[in-house]
Amino acid sequence: MCILIVAVLFLTAWTFVMADDPRDEPDTVVRGGKLFSRARDEMNPAASKLNERDCVEVDYFCGIPFVFNGLCCSGNCVFVCTPQG
């Protein structure tokens, strides 16, 4: 039990020692770029392939029927994409 407590205390201290300190700007810059990834609001959304999802046209199979499942361009799925309205 004592070893477990010592291990937890050591890992907690290690986390605080290795945490990123924004005041250490020269230490976090590597060849003109940041060592750590940029904040979400600084990222380029056009660089992400996940933001470019194609939708399925009307009369094509869309899977399990859910309304607004995100697969159909119209938003209506009943095994095939149905027109909106």
UniProtKB/Swiss-Prot annotation:
Top-rank lineage group of the source organism: Eukaryota
Example of a GO cellular component annotation carried by this entry: extracellular region
Keyword Secreted: yes
Listed PROSITE patterns: OMEGA_CONOTOXIN
Cysteine-cysteine disulfides: 55-73, 62-77, 72-81
Localisation per UniProt entry: Secreted
Name used for this protein in its record: Omega-conotoxin-like Am6.5
PTM (free text): Is not hydroxylated.
Residue ranges listed under propeptide: 20-53
Taxonomic classification: Eukaryota, Metazoa, Spiralia, Lophotrochozoa, Mollusca
Main location: secreted
Domain remark text: The cysteine framework is VI/VII (C-C-CC-C-C).
Alphabetically ordered keywords of this record: Amidation, Calcium channel impairing toxin, Disulfide bond, Ion channel impairing toxin, Knottin, Secreted, Signal, Toxin, Voltage-gated calcium channel impairing toxin
GO molecular function: calcium channel regulator activity; ion channel inhibitor activity; toxin activity
Family: Belongs to the conotoxin O1 family.
Function: Omega-conotoxins act at presynaptic membranes, they bind and block voltage-gated calcium channels (Cav).
Provenance organism: Conus amadis
Signal peptide: 1-19
A Pfam family assignment: Conotoxin
Positions bearing Glutamine amide: 84
Organs and tissues of expression: Expressed by the venom duct.
